[in-house]
Amino acid sequence: MVSSLKYLVFVLVAFASQLSLAADITPKMQKNIDVYKTKIVQWAADPVIVNAVKEANARGAIPMMGNAKWREIDPKDPLIQGFETNAAGVLVTKWMNADPKGINKIVVSGNKSQRVAFTSMPAIYIGKGKPNFDEAFSGKVWQQPESKPDPSTQIDTVQIAAPIKDGGEVIGVLLVSLTASNL
């Protein structure tokens, strides 16, 4: 009986700690998020972003690169630095640095959800199967329903994403992590 009670308490504490990681979005936050959503739709149409995604889609994903292998790479590796220093990486870093309290990460992905450019190394290389990629790639502007720690930065974040289009065709996704405490 005592061990069952201890187990129940353990399960409840573990569940409660997981709940504390996510937080509701307030009406004030939503108003600010909506402003960012409008902004990222414009960013997703920037010719530098569109051209980088078109080129990356033509090359394809890095051969044999999966999420497990990606996690083993040092963020200072030249491969990773290339995503930050290519034309799209420089542009998204400029956008983030213009709003350092509001934006903590930007990631550009191609049509196979492979990374094209980013401001800092994301936790995964392939985003397919995640709502932030799948919803935006279907042509919708996507928003995370609550704030929670970003997997790579651990900053309490609300992620938003917009489709990157070439004409009317969706060719990639622009993901922006907003710092929840500044919304």
PLM feature segments, named:
Residues 22-76, 100-102, 142:
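Juxtamembrane extracytoplasmic/periplasmic/luminal helical "stalk" adjacent to the first N-terminal
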Residues 30, 79-102, 178-183:
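Solvent-exposed, extracytoplasmic
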